[in-house]
Amino acid sequence: MESVLDAFDQYLALERGRSDHTRRAYLGDLRSLFAFVDERTPGADLGSLTLPVLRAWLSAQAAAGTARTTLARRTSAVKTFTAWAVRRGLMASDPATRLQMPKARRTLPAVLRQDQARDALDAANSGAQQGDPLALRDRLIVEMLYATGIRVSELCGLDIDDVDTSRRLLRVLGKGDKQRTVPFGEPAEQALRAWLTSGRPALATAESGPALLLGARGRRLDPRQARTVVHETVGAVAGAPDIGPHGLRHSAATHLLEGGADLRIVQELLGHSTLATTQLYTHVTVARLRAVHDQAHPRA
């Protein structure tokens, strides 16, 4: 089965443009399914993936307390895989065409109030005053995530050339390799300049490459490290909810909307193909993004 999964992984990467995170999740889901099938019928092949078997696997997952969002993703993984396998001639028919995807409840993570966000950013700024390279980096992580609302994976994937400091713009590569331009404000610019001038040069090694953000050993920053930075920074604010980068992203979106930003503009800034249950997707110019961001974001 591993050779089949390798081929499927290549399909997800090259033809579907799925992220590394999504591909790892899908392959893990399929390995779970194959283990379930093998336990029931040792040595079974792809022909053993019938609709009743798929339903039994999902039922077992649900009974074990698997979250609805995870069940929805696993259903999607199976449906994508079986459709691909039929096209490749690996299966005679697609058993997942009638497999129902459990509806995932939409639950928004906790968000910061504007005063809590300000306190968190002030704390990060205070910690960076001594010029410690890691403190300068941590300040930039928190400041840029809140200023732009981008995903932590997008932030850690940025190269130096993706940043236009003079125009305060980021070129972000989002899900499905979709590129978008996101503005940021003056506080984020100050944090960025301090990092590029004093922080990054102190950590850079031959392995750094073009990466904007670096870990302590000079390699591209891992998103897990960035999550730790956000948790620790926000956790120091009295009364603030325990949030990570995703919560900071939702905080940025919430504060933009509170400031009067149009929902479709926020959708473009966040890189969503849909926002909530809507099907709207509106392309806006960089100038419009800049104007709305300056008017609506509390730290523009």
Swiss-Prot record:
<dbReference type="InterPro" id="IPR050090">
    <property type="entry name" value="Tyrosine_recombinase_XerCD"/>
</dbReference>
<protein>
    <recommendedName>
        <fullName>Tyrosine recombinase XerC</fullName>
    </recommendedName>
</protein>
<dbReference type="GO" id="GO:0007059">
    <property type="term" value="P:chromosome segregation"/>
</dbReference>
<dbReference type="InterPro" id="IPR004107">
    <property type="entry name" value="Integrase_SAM-like_N"/>
</dbReference>
<feature type="active site">
    <location>
        <position position="175"/>
    </location>
</feature>
<feature type="active site">
    <location>
        <position position="246"/>
    </location>
</feature>
<dbReference type="GO" id="GO:0006313">
    <property type="term" value="P:DNA transposition"/>
</dbReference>
<comment type="subunit">
    <text>Forms a cyclic heterotetrameric complex composed of two molecules of XerC and two molecules of XerD.</text>
</comment>
<keyword id="KW-0159">Chromosome partition</keyword>
<dbReference type="InterPro" id="IPR011010">
    <property type="entry name" value="DNA_brk_join_enz"/>
</dbReference>
<keyword id="KW-0233">DNA recombination</keyword>
<comment type="similarity">
    <text>Belongs to the 'phage' integrase family. XerC subfamily.</text>
</comment>
<dbReference type="InterPro" id="IPR002104">
    <property type="entry name" value="Integrase_catalytic"/>
</dbReference>
<feature type="active site">
    <location>
        <position position="151"/>
    </location>
</feature>
<keyword id="KW-0131">Cell cycle</keyword>
<dbReference type="InterPro" id="IPR010998">
    <property type="entry name" value="Integrase_recombinase_N"/>
</dbReference>
<keyword id="KW-0238">DNA-binding</keyword>
<dbReference type="InterPro" id="IPR044068">
    <property type="entry name" value="CB"/>
</dbReference>
<feature type="active site">
    <location>
        <position position="249"/>
    </location>
</feature>
<dbReference type="GO" id="GO:0003677">
    <property type="term" value="F:DNA binding"/>
</dbReference>
<keyword id="KW-0963">Cytoplasm</keyword>
<keyword id="KW-0132">Cell division</keyword>
<comment type="function">
    <text>Site-specific tyrosine recombinase, which acts by catalyzing the cutting and rejoining of the recombining DNA molecules. The XerC-XerD complex is essential to convert dimers of the bacterial chromosome into monomers to permit their segregation at cell division. It also contributes to the segregational stability of plasmids.</text>
</comment>
<dbReference type="InterPro" id="IPR023009">
    <property type="entry name" value="Tyrosine_recombinase_XerC/XerD"/>
</dbReference>
<dbReference type="Pfam" id="PF00589">
    <property type="entry name" value="Phage_integrase"/>
</dbReference>
<dbReference type="Pfam" id="PF02899">
    <property type="entry name" value="Phage_int_SAM_1"/>
</dbReference>
<dbReference type="GO" id="GO:0051301">
    <property type="term" value="P:cell division"/>
</dbReference>
<keyword id="KW-0229">DNA integration</keyword>
<dbReference type="GO" id="GO:0009037">
    <property type="term" value="F:tyrosine-based site-specific recombinase activity"/>
</dbReference>
<feature type="domain" description="Core-binding (CB)">
    <location>
        <begin position="1"/>
        <end position="86"/>
    </location>
</feature>
<dbReference type="GO" id="GO:0005737">
    <property type="term" value="C:cytoplasm"/>
</dbReference>
<feature type="active site" description="O-(3'-phospho-DNA)-tyrosine intermediate">
    <location>
        <position position="281"/>
    </location>
</feature>
<feature type="active site">
    <location>
        <position position="272"/>
    </location>
</feature>
<dbReference type="InterPro" id="IPR013762">
    <property type="entry name" value="Integrase-like_cat_sf"/>
</dbReference>
<feature type="domain" description="Tyr recombinase">
    <location>
        <begin position="107"/>
        <end position="294"/>
    </location>
</feature>
